[in-house]
Amino acid sequence: MYSIKTDHKLMPRERLIRLGPEKLSNQEQLAILLRTGNKEKHVLELSAYLLSSLDSLADLKKFSLQELQRLSGIGKVKAIEIKAMLELADRIQIAGQAVADPVLSSAQVAEKMMIELGDKQQEHLVAIYLDSQNKIIEEKTIFIGTVRKSIAEPREILYYACKNMATSLIVVHNHPSGLTKPSANDYHFTEKIKRSCDYLGLICLDHIIVSKYDYYSFREKSDLF
């Protein structure tokens, strides 16, 4: 659990101006984002309460909008603001990790995508489009799955490949269960997308399954490539 302190004489905004954002605690940073408290709790107490509900700061990402709203003092508006802040932070991190150099291995792509998709609670299918120098042209989320729906047709993957005039592509999806062992459907889909790419003169470099801590590369571990 976090150790929460509320003895600062200056309010978080004043401390940020005077000392810089890197000097503020997680509690103070969150208090700035929350902006105000409520009738029962000062904003610093509210941020302390929220952080005390976590084992680690990373757990904040796991709260759904509804779960945040169920916390005392966190209404709908504050819950929306927190979720938006977390999503923006993810996008900033992803943008900062954009691969400018050529993609040289499946492991390189897997490491990047484990960060991006490892915490997702639904299955995400992402296509990474590359030019003739193996540099990334675009990374596109093609599909977000539900319990009743699974990855089906490669049509949309190929549409964006043609739109980007890509030379090759890599398909990545996550297993929310944390287990990266491919299913029979994963094998079938890999064969299907590879055949479709061959038909259009595209190179399917790999299909990678990721979790938070592991990955499976069809190129590295199967005989499909």
UniProtKB/Swiss-Prot annotation:
UniProt keywords, alphabetically: Hydrolase, Metal-binding, Metalloprotease, Protease, Zinc
Residue stretches making up the MPN domain: 102-224
Molecular function via GO: metal ion binding; metallopeptidase activity
The keyword Metal-binding belongs to this UniProt entry's keyword annotation: yes
InterPro entries according to UniProt: MPN (IPR037518), RadC_JAB (IPR025657), RuvA_2-like (IPR010994), UPF0758 (IPR001405), UPF0758_CS (IPR020891), UPF0758_N (IPR046778)
GO biological process per UniProt: proteolysis
Keyword Metal-binding annotated: yes
Classification via SUPFAM superfamilies: RuvA domain 2-like
Family stated for the protein in its record: Belongs to the UPF0758 family.
Protein name (Swiss-Prot/TrEMBL): UPF0758 protein SEQ_1136
Organism annotation: Streptococcus equi subsp. equi (strain 4047)
Higher taxonomy: Bacteria, Bacillati, Bacillota, Bacilli, Lactobacillales
